[in-house]
Amino acid sequence: MSTYNKVKGSKFETDVMKFLRSLGHFAERLAKAGSSDEGDIVTIIAGQTYILECKNRKKLDLPAFWAEAVKEAANYAKARGQVVAPPAFVVVKRRNASIADAWVVQPLSEWINNIERDINANTNGRDQHDGDLGTKAGGA
């Protein structure tokens, strides 16, 4: 990878980190460690840790980007003695668009698993809702 591309990628990572921070979320860039990379950014949103792999490239190779994100999330967990890796996402820069309009990519099955995990975590000990938009289970 050329120096120009490294600078471009590094700037995108920094922009993503700053955007997350501007919304009040913890976000840090992670150090590069070759085959032991742990992702580009770790962020904590609503108490959940996420690993972000940021890509600022003209040519998209989503399967390769996703494989890298999963591997690096596993490296992150392993380095901290965690059994389960945090959810990983690929953040892809959109041409001629703001950082807020970057694409966030994850396979559908992973996304569903994350949604179900978050719902289960957020409904333990709280009022649960039925499928009727905002109506509490057991009556209105």
Please describe what each predicted stretch is.
Residues M1-A140:
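Catalytic phosphate/metal-binding cores of nucleic-acid and nucleotide-processing enzymes, i.e., regions
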